Amino acid sequence: DELLTNEQRWLPILARAVSVQVPEPIFIGAPSATFAHPWSVVPWFPGTAASDLDVAQRNSCMEGLLDFFIDLHVQALPGAPENPYRGLAINRREFDESFRRAVAGRQDAAALLERWLAWRGVPDWDAGDVWVHGDAHPGNLILDASGDLAAVIDWGDVTAGDPASDLAT
């Protein structure tokens, strides 16, 4: 419920700040005896999730994605959601054995582990909390027929924090 209420509260504000479409609620429903959770009606965005395209096709949206992050990564407003995982500096996250398992068996496993450990050594972001999407992976990036970034969806993890965390999902 908290993820949805974060979207309901903050997307009307963030929609005016970014250069692409976001699922700003058209209607917000309250929990009831029929359905015990908050709910929203949001617009449908035609296009294709970047995750459904090959890497070369995804590359066409990079300029739009950069513009989106420039628009989004500004000082967060007071009361912005806090998230115990998203928005934290990458080097402050618990190193998870799942990373070692994920790269095990790859020819480049040693290089990936070395790179991960180097990233963890980067100094923390200290320029103040900015808006962070929190889950900006290719499945949440909608590209139009031209391959341009048209919409960014799934804002349940929106938070204030380190902008680099948006590049880690």
Regions found by a protein language model. Name each.
Residues 129-132, 137-169:
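Active-site Asp-x-Gly
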Residues 1, 59-62, 89-92, 106-114, ...:
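Short, structured helix-loop boundary elements
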Residues 43-47, 97, 156, 166-168:
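Short glycine/proline- and charge-enriched loop/turn segments
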Residues 40, 67-70, 83-124, 147:
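Active-site catalytic-loop/activation-segment of kinase and kinase-like phosphoryl-transfer enzymes
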Residues 11, 26-28, 116-120, 138:
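A generic local structural motif
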Residues 1-89, 126:
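ATP-binding pocket architecture of kinase catalytic cores
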